[in-house]
């Protein structure tokens, strides 16, 4: 067991556009005086996490990322290693990130990615930010792997979609936001839809396996009604994360755990 050197750790799952719900989750916590001392995120959680760690508020980030169209985030490419490019997200990070390295961030951050050469989860916490956040967000089939030091990396959700591992032994309290509930889908059409669905199904096991490690874990079931590649509902997703978290924070057992 490591020394619990941080008071509160935030853990943010992957989930594509559903990650806007993370921002509502954080907004509700902030209103109750709960701020992260360290953050661990995968994919969309890495994107939200790096901007929070850089000093932006949840509503700042909502405004920054709420562009309205998936084409503002990603572009079709020749399907050699991936169907899409994350060029829009890279552009947003280049334009807005004040920190250039993990060491420059205001809050310590872990970013989970999958080393596909060695078949394992990797938790980045040092060096260049943008390439490692991009690696964490590179959904297989949809996006090309990111090569760092001759190793190919894909989305952290392949191996760890709720990355509590880096912080579970060093935080007194851990709160988490999971945005990947999966419900019934009647029909899937097109390669991108099938790839998206397959990836999401692989990630659902995380909540049941790890729920006991959290003092508060928010996983709004209504998120199953939103696609992971459709950012058009950003305001709705933010509100869903916010309202679900506010409701959870009215529970006296949770309030005692969080010293509220």
Q: Predicted regions: what is each one?
A:
Residues 1-42, 50-260:
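Patatin-like phospholipase
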